Amino acid sequence: MIKTNVLRRAMDEIAARKGEFTLFALLMRADAPGTWDLVVSASWLESGNLKATREFVRLLAQSMGEESLHQFSRVVALDSNDAPVRFILENLPVEDDELRVQSTDLLGLQIQEAIIFRAKKPRPSPAALPNKALHPPAQKTRHG
């Protein structure tokens, strides 16, 4: 069995270095009992970007140990706009806890068990927020 406290620590260490995760979860598919998929989503971890996924796996191995990676049948990176991520964020939000779900259907994928460590929309980065210093409030003028 995967040591969830070790995985949580790895998640926290990687998030401190790279940025928050939108989703960090273990899923055991009904068609692959006894094996776990690690499913992650983060703004810095693009779906389909092998370089970013490779970097994530390297950081995971660095944090948990190379041998620990054999506990996962696969590591899946999803975009935050992907339907499964949006569904989990909307229906199973988790911030600093651990949510366990048994025997569920996740948008057509039969899940025997899920452990969700984080399912939270990321906070906007300071660069994405409007800078009030650059946009002062409109001045009222009197005509008269």
Q: Language model features by range: what are they?
A:
Residues 27-31, 43-44, 79, 120-122:
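Short, flexible beta-strand-to-coil junctions
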Residues 35-45:
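Catalytic metal-binding acidic patch
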Residues 67-144:
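Catalytic "initiation/cleavage/transfer" segments centered on a nucleophilic residue
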